[in-house]
């Protein structure tokens, strides 16, 4: 029996008048535009269709046959990627209609219908694998994010992602993190400053790195510095860093870092973030917990497509 999808609860959102599941947060009002992701989806289709197209479907299915299909969850998780799936089908044939039943950001149970499809049978079969590839991967990212978000519930820590994304998929993976209730760190090297260990080594120290940045970028740019010792933390604070990344520190050292910082900078914990450790890290008092594994190693969610 089909299970009803539910949206992960957030006080700032309510269900629509129609009672359909609604996304997690206001950020979802602006998912990646079709123009932005179309090159990614088109590349995936070209890769799959090759030189001759879908030779199996074209040989078996009459050109004028229409079909009705459903995309359904085969395990519990958080949905993401419908925007890419819809575009995949429409690039194959614009007449394919995808109707979401559990929008991106919805929490679903096994058997929940995520979306319905109507249109030419050939187009649905041809676009199936590419569409599902986006859904299973991005839903996996959203689900992994949601698990960490739930694990730190009741603390002040927020879960954020990193630049450790799969090449070409960053905008979609970061969207999937938001679907799971997480936040995005910088999108690229051009939109935020983060002084990392190799910058510090090359520049001759934390203070020297911050001084060089201030001289070039001015006082209005927020500077974040990666540190792995208390001495580096104190140097970063003295030099005026507004945010500090605590790299691979144990929770007890993080607590000490929080006490020393005393609100002078925001603190981000990073490195070795696991489901088992994340609660203790959050309880240290840090503001953010960043995880590269959310995007580079998330397990795919089991989702299938069936004709009905």
Located regions from the model:
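C-terminal active-site rim and adjoining tail of enzyme catalytic domains
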Residues: 248
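Acidic/glycine-rich phosphate/pyrophosphate-binding loops and surrounding catalytic core
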Residues: 2, 6-11, 20-239, 243, ...
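Active-site loop ensemble at the mouth of alpha/beta enzyme cores that anchors a bound cofactor
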Residues: 304-308
């Amino acid at each position: 029996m089909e299970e009803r999808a539910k949206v992960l609860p957030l006080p700032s959102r309510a269900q629509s008048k129609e009672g359909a599941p609604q996304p997690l947060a206001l950020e979802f009002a602006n998912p990646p535009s079709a123009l932005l992701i179309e090159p990614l989806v088109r590349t995936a289709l070209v890769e799959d269709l090759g030189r001759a197209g879908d030779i199996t479907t074209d040989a078996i299915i009459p050109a004028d046959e229409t079909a009705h299909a459903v995309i359904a969850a085969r395990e519990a998780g958080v949905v993401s990627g419908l925007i890419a799936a819809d575009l995949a089908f429409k690039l194959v044939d614009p007449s394919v209609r995808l109707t979401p039943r559990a929008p991106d950001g919805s929490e679903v149970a096994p058997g929940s219908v995520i979306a319905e499809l109507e249109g030419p049978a050939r187009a649905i079969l041809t676009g199936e694998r590419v569409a599902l590839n986006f859904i299973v991967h991005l839903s996996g990212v959203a689900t992994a994010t949601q698990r960490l978000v739930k694990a730190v519930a009741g603390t002040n820590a927020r879960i954020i992602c990193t630049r450790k994304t799969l090449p070409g998929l960053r905008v979609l993976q970061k969207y999937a993190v938001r679907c799971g209730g997480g936040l995005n760190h910088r999108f690229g090297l051009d939109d935020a400053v983060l002084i990392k260990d190799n910058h510090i080594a090359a520049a001759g120290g934390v203070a020297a790195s911050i001084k060089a940045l201030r001289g070039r970028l001015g006082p209005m740019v927020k500077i974040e510095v990666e540190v792995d010792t208390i001495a580096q933390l104190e140097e970063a604070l003295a030099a005026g860093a507004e945010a500090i990344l605590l790299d691979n520190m144990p929770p007890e050292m993080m607590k000490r870092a929080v006490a020393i910082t005393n609100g002078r900078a925001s603190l981000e914990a990073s490195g070795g973030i696991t489901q088992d450790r994340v609660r203790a890290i959050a309880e240290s008092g840090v503001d953010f917990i960043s995880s590269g594994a959310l995007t580079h190693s998330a397990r795919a969610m089991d989702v299938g497509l069936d004709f009905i």
